[in-house]
Regions:
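Short, conserved catalytic or interaction motifs in soluble domains
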Residues: 29, 87, 144
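A positional/architectural concept
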Residues: 1-76
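Glycine-rich active-site/cofactor-binding loop and its immediate structural neighborhood
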Residues: 62-92, 96-98
Length: 185
């Protein structure tokens, strides 16, 4: 029982760390990356579809991404979705591909992105702490129902605290890495 609760909490905490990593991937650093387009959905014949399913991406230079749609008919919708996103780029359409040129990051913009990264890291830490609280409530319920003893619950809570620290430290490490990436000129 206790191991099941701890195992489930650990798995969910891993997912929270991974979700934070994906959020950080969408934050633009100095180099343009296809992962920046992960959150963009395109209206494809009436169905919201992730952009990765509709096109391939290449990056010939550090600040340029070329998007080649599999279906040329979706070009206008892809262009509109990119323009409406928060990426801050205006794609140029040559009929077969979309070319997105990202401007150099200013110091002010870098600091803005660092604030966004810190907010996303805090969201990740809050998610991990909420998972800890839920798991702790389950453990206390087991003790209250008389299914396990107080010593078992105390030991499990210590293990749970260790898992929580491990996952929040992982999020902090991701944040430090993203900050250094953003400050790199």
């Amino acid at each position: 029982m206790i191991n099941d609760i701890l195992h489930e909490a650990d798995g969910k905490m891993d997912k929270s760390v991974e979700a934070t990593r994906e959020e950080f991937a969408a934050i633009r650093a100095g180099r343009a990356q296809p992962s920046m387009f992960n959150k963009i959905t395109v209206d494809y014949y009436g169905t919201p579809t992730p952009l990765q399913q509709l096109a391939s991406f290449t990056s010939p230079e550090a600040r340029i991404i070329i998007i080649s749609p599999y279906d040329i008919g979706a070009m206008g919708n892809i262009e509109r979705a990119i323009r409406d996103s928060d990426l801050g780029v205006n794609p140029s359409n040559d009929g077969k591909t979309l070319r997105c040129v990202f401007p150099e990051l200013t110091e002010e913009r870098r600091k803005e992105y660092i604030k966004v990264a810190k907010a996303k890291a805090e969201d990740g830490r809050v998610a991990v702490r909420n998972l800890r609280r839920t798991a702790k409530q389950h453990l206390e319920k087991l003790e209250k129902d008389g299914e396990v003893g107080k010593d078992d619950v105390t030991g499990a809570e210590k293990r749970l605290d260790g898992m929580t620290k491990k996952h929040t430290d992982a999020i902090d490490d991701l944040l430090k890495h993203k900050e250094s990436e953003l400050l790199e000129v």
